[in-house]
């Protein structure tokens, strides 16, 4: 993948950055694509770096993801809850599966979606082959993960656990407005204001 380079004028001349490093200067982390261990490690490292720089200043996590590996996503989620710096989440494009859980895990009042973004929740997917006993062990693990993910989603949204369990039985798609009603996000952003805020 080609990563754009941006050039900035500084007192010492020109300086070039890859686009993600430049965004990081403004405390912006971009999660684009499926969540796996490699992506999770990059996102976590950036969060820890920004936390060390200023633990009181917001971190902005932009999400455009179809989801991915549950344990990788939970590593990001737990780091969001662990650090002191508030993490604002913004859905651009889509936040599906683990992406939706991460979106809901942002600081309350600072979870956003762009106008035409799509949000989708569902139960975790899994596949395993091998001996019958091992298949049974993995099936039990998936059921435990499903229960925990539903509990987290219920806690983050304010929905009853029974409703979340019913809604995640199959793919459950939402618009930004529907995700706001559900409690996954707090507001829909249409454009940045000149002062850097949103409206």
From Swiss-Prot:
GO biological process, one term: protein quality control for misfolded or incompletely synthesized proteins
Active site positions, chain numbering: 97, 122
Cystine pairings recorded for this chain: none
Main location: cytoplasm
Alphabetical keyword list: Cytoplasm, Hydrolase, Protease, Serine protease
This protein's record includes keyword Protease: yes
Enzyme Commission code(s) on record: 3.4.21.92
GO terms for MF: ATP-dependent peptidase activity; ATPase binding; serine-type endopeptidase activity
Compartment(s) where it occurs, according to its Swiss-Prot or TrEMBL record: Cytoplasm
Catalytic activity of the protein: Hydrolysis of proteins to small peptides in the presence of ATP and magnesium. alpha-casein is the usual test substrate. In the absence of ATP, only oligopeptides shorter than five residues are hydrolyzed (such as succinyl-Leu-Tyr-|-NHMec, and Leu-Tyr-Leu-|-Tyr-Trp, in which cleavage of the -Tyr-|-Leu- and -Tyr-|-Trp bonds also occurs)
A Pfam family assignment: CLP_protease
CC terms in the record's Gene Ontology section: cytoplasm; endopeptidase Clp complex
Source domain of life: Bacteria
InterPro entries noted in UniProt: ClpP (IPR001907), ClpP/crotonase-like_dom_sf (IPR029045), ClpP/TepA (IPR023562), ClpP_Ser_AS (IPR018215)
PROSITE patterns on file: CLP_PROTEASE_SER
Function: Cleaves peptides in various proteins in a process that requires ATP hydrolysis. Has a chymotrypsin-like activity. Plays a major role in the degradation of misfolded proteins.
HAMAP family (UniProt xref): ClpP
Family that this chain belongs to: Belongs to the peptidase S14 family.
Subunit organization: Fourteen ClpP subunits assemble into 2 heptameric rings which stack back to back to give a disk-like structure with a central cavity, resembling the structure of eukaryotic proteasomes.
Protein name: ATP-dependent Clp protease proteolytic subunit
